[in-house]
Amino acid sequence: MRIVNSRYILIIGLVAFLIVGFFSYLLWFLVENSGKVQDEVPEFAGGKTCIGCHPKEYSLWKESDHANAMLIASDSSVKGDFNNAELTFNGKTSRFYKRGNKFYVFTQGEGGIQKEYRIAYTFGIRPLQQYLVPFENGRYQCLPIAWDTRNNKWFNMAAMVYSPSDLQPDNWLYWTNQSQNWNSMCAECHSTNLHKNFDPVAKTYNATWQDINVNCEACHGPGSSHIKWAGLPVDERP
């Protein structure tokens, strides 16, 4: 009996020693490598960092829908006719024009009042291009009138999307209301590493992004670790 008990005690002691040893090593490993793990968390670097190693892919991307998902309104990005073009819908006429290098629309807006709005960004490219208008408190709203890039003409989206098409200013779907708010309804899919930065108390937005459009990292993930890896000599790459 004493021999058997001694064996049990020896086995239990050995198991306890192994368990304590394992967890001691695990604790040491975590403490020793905690800083390294933190340093290796990849960060967004921006789509332009891809050009050096992937010029062909970047060139193809530049012509894609992703690259044109959202851009600053300019002569190169705007496809619509802003040469004093007009569109009449439900008895209301909207006019599109330029002053200098800025794009404007005179249309029915808040409270149903006709007034001038500045176009800040293009939104998409085909089969239609929409336009974003800046408002107070960091808001951007999607203009309901879009440019048909296949037939080269203006059209009001309400004619095809909404019923009734004659939306009133108190309707949630009206273009200056929440339904057409870029910050909360559209932004995350059209820009890369976007942060809305909404202040619920002040009811303001302060949106930030890595790239204004959908860059390589939007699908492939943050690129800093890959860039670091690509910068190593070939025989040193893990």
Language-model segments: residues:
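Active-site-surrounding "flap" and adjacent substrate/cofactor-binding loops of secreted or lumenal enzymes
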Residues: 66-84
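N-terminal Sec-pathway targeting helices
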Residues: 2-17
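Soluble catalytic regions of membrane-associated enzymes that act on cell-envelope
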Residues: 87
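Extended surface/linker regions that mediate inter-domain or inter-protein docking
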Residues: 99-238
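Ser/Thr/Pro/Gly-rich low-complexity linker/stalk segments immediately outside membranes or between
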Residues: 28-43
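Hydrophobic cores of alpha-helical transmembrane segments in multi-pass integral membrane proteins
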Residues: 17-23, 54
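Mature N-terminal segment immediately following signal peptide/propeptide cleavage
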Residues: 41-67, 71-72
